[in-house]
A protein has these predicted regions:
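A conserved glycine-rich beta-strand in the N-terminal activation segment of trypsin-fold
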Residues: 218-290, 507-580
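Structural boundary/hinge residues at secondary-structure and domain interfaces
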Residues: 62-216, 261-310, 326-435, 446-488, ...
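N-terminal targeting leaders characterized by basic, low-complexity, disordered sequences
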Residues: 1-60
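Hydrophobic, ordered structural segments
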Residues: 122, 226-255, 318-348, 373
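Ordered core of a single globular domain
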Residues: 436-440
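Broad, structure-driven detector of short, well-ordered beta-strand segments within folded domains
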Residues: 168-172, 223-228, 302, 306-322, ...
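Short, hydrophobic/aromatic-rich segments at coil-to-beta transitions
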Residues: 167, 210-218, 314, 497-506
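Helix N-cap motif at beta-to-alpha junctions
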Residues: 190-195, 236-240, 442-446, 529-532
């Protein structure tokens, strides 16, 4: 409006001026003036737009806030309803699709370990498992059901299927009054408790009685069965089941509510074939002696206990994948004992570059970064911050160093600096026999070669390798006595050139056996086979090695990207008589401040 008013005012003044100069009609004068004025205004507008395009100005906006009480209340109501829906959905999922863990009913201060097996034959984890093992009838669904029939004494379809739920297993606990006693509890989810009770009562070998508000089915043979929520509990003695029922009525913390179990459970997949939990703080000698692998070994369990206590707890899950099995574990360390230690967490990124010197048909490979840090980590865990333990361990290492390499070689000054970078151990096949190779990436090639030569020379000079010989002595009365003595083996140092690389051998006695080493690029290779060293030199040249093999691509690469160290074992070749359907295992470990995460892939033959 302001712009139009100004134009009209100017027009009136110009009309008066024009009328004075010439006697044109007032309407014509007005028409011409307005036409000219609008042209001028349009030109000015165009100029302003051009100027504005060169110097754009930011427009200021005033945001007017308005609050609508009804909308706010409605939004809050939606948020509340959504929270309720999510919570209800989670609880429904927990109840309907995922069985409650037995950990909820176990005392945290007495439970040593438990293992849970998925017993839902319609679950995709079990269907995948049976598909992977279809060539092994002894691991079929039918065989598993036959095993259940044998253990539970009943027909699967008629007696067990009508009540058996999705979870079953065994628990190991310390005795309530005597920690040296080992209590064993079997459990199975009863998806239909009425059918489960009918199954027990039909046996007519159990008498029903009351204890602590629970029904107990007791047999004359000492066996006892009780129900805790949806679980059937079975023990071979009355006191064990009574102790567990007493715990249900107490205010004591369960394993499920403990921090260590939560740390492990949160790192485990929801769907799995089986799950193992171990609380190392509660491990007893009685439990260790129950482990088949340790049962027949001459082990001083008292000396083993301090190391076990540092480990805190471990969880391990078996998962069936489309083409293999996976074992995922989370080993938690005792935070109070390792919180000040700086070597627990691995900082270096491991690439497994040493695999280019290893045969593509290797029987086994284990590699990582910074073995110096590994040793220090192990010492820190054992010592729990006690300097005296560290000093004693250093003395032990130095004593062994002096035994084989003499007093001139100092473990911390000469050997430890060689162990800072990448390392690997490999087992290869040579003429049907296994040979061993150890690899070290050198930091300072010139300096490190001198140290290796010093160690080799001292080993050749000192010996440290003995053989047993029988020496006869004639006594004064003419009696001949025999004595077994340890005689040092003669060690001969020899060198040979192969493709421009010097291979040094330390041959023991008159035989060809011994130790051989060479430096390829910046990698030191030590082996018990001369031909093994030559083979590693050839592998680097012809590019036919583990690094570029299908084995590396399919089995090692998947675990390498998230691992501080890796391992690979060809069980079919390494242990051909092993009665397992697994042909190869590849795995990796990832170190954190409070624990170690491991993933291992099990490949079916």
């Amino acid at each position: 409006m302001g712009k139009k008013a100004n134009i009209k005012k100017i027009v009136r003044e110009l009309i008066k001026e024009k009328e004075g100069k010439d006697k044109k009609d007032k309407r014509k004068i007005k028409k011409e003036l307005i036409k000219g004025m609008w042209r001028e205004e349009q030109v000015k507008e165009k100029d302003k737009k051009k100027e504005a395009s060169h110097h754009p100005k930011k427009e200021k906006f005033k945001i007017k806030l308005s609050f609508n009480g009804k909308k706010i209340f409605g939004g809050a109501l939606v948020a509340i309803m959504l929270s309720i829906l999510i919570t209800t959905g989670y609880l429904l999922f927990e109840k309907v699709f995922k069985p409650i863990s037995i950990a909820k009913y176990l005392p945290s201060d007495r439970t040593i370990a438990f293992v849970e097996f998925n017993s839902n034959f319609n679950h995709n984890q079990l269907t995948k498992s049976f598909e992977l093992l279809q060539d092994y009838p002894e691991y079929s669904e039918k065989k598993v059901q036959e095993l259940l029939e044998q253990k539970l004494v009943g027909n699967y379809d008629a007696d067990l299927k009508v009540w058996l739920g999705r979870n079953m297993g065994v628990v190991f606990m310390k005795g309530k009054s005597d920690g040296k006693i080992l209590e064993k509890i079997y459990f199975a989810e009863a998806i239909n408790k009425s059918n489960a009770k009918r199954f027990i009562e039909n046996k007519k070998t159990y008498a029903k009685m009351e204890y602590a508000g629970y029904e107990i089915y007791a047999a004359e043979t000492g066996e006892n069965i009780a129900f805790i929520d949806s679980y059937l509990i079975y023990t071979k003695d009355k006191k064990t089941i009574e102790n567990l029922l007493d715990f249900q009525n107490s205010e004591n913390k369960s394993v499920f509510l403990s921090e260590k179990y939560s740390r492990i459970s949160n790192n485990m997949p929801i769907n799995k074939v089986a799950f193992l939990y171990v609380n190392f703080n509660e491990v007893s000698e009685a439990f260790l002696k129950k482990i088949p692998l340790l049962r027949n070994m001459d082990i001083n369990f008292q000396q083993l206990m301090p190391l076990i206590k540092v480990l805190d707890s471990d969880g391990m899950a078996l998962i069936a994948m489309n083409d293999k099995f996976a074992v995922q574990s989370f080993l938690t360390l005792n935070v109070d004992k390792v919180k000040e230690e700086k070597y627990i967490n691995m900082k270096e990124k491991y690439s497994a570059s040493i695999t280019q010197y290893v045969s593509e048909n290797a029987l086994a490979f284990y590699g990582g970064q910074n073995i110096e840090g590994q040793i220090k980590r192990f010492i820190e865990i054992l010592s729990s911050g006690k300097q005296s333990v560290v000093e004693n361990f250093d003395k032990i290492l130095q004593n062994y160093t002096q035994k084989y390499f003499g007093s001139e070689v100092i473990f911390n000054l000469d050997i430890m600096p060689l162990l800072k970078n990448e390392y690997a151990l490999a087992i290869e096949n040579e003429g049907g026999k296994p040979i061993y190779k150890f690899f070290l990436e050198l930091s300072d090639k010139k300096k490190d070669i001198q140290i290796l030569e010093k160690i080799a020379n001292n080993f050749a000079k000192i010996g440290g390798v003995y053989k047993q010989e029988v020496i006869e002595h004639t006594l004064p009365d003419g009696t001949v006595s025999k004595e077994i003595v340890a005689v040092p083996e003669a060690i001969k140092k020899e060198s040979e050139d192969y493709k421009g690389i010097k291979i040094t051998g330390l041959k023991i006695g008159g035989e060809s056996k011994g130790f051989f080493y060479a430096i390829i690029d910046n990698i030191a290779i030590i082996s018990d086979s001369f031909n093994g060293i030559k083979n590693s030199i050839d592998l680097k040249e012809n590019k036919s090695n583990l690094k570029v093999s299908d084995t590396f691509l399919k089995l090692i690469t998947p675990v390498l990207k998230n691992s501080d160290e890796i391992s690979y074992f060809n069980l079919a070749k390494l242990l051909p008589n092993l009665p397992l359907p697994i042909s190869e295992i590849s795995g990796g470990n990832n170190y954190f401040d409070d624990g170690i995460v491991s993933i291992n892939y099990l490949h079916v033959k």
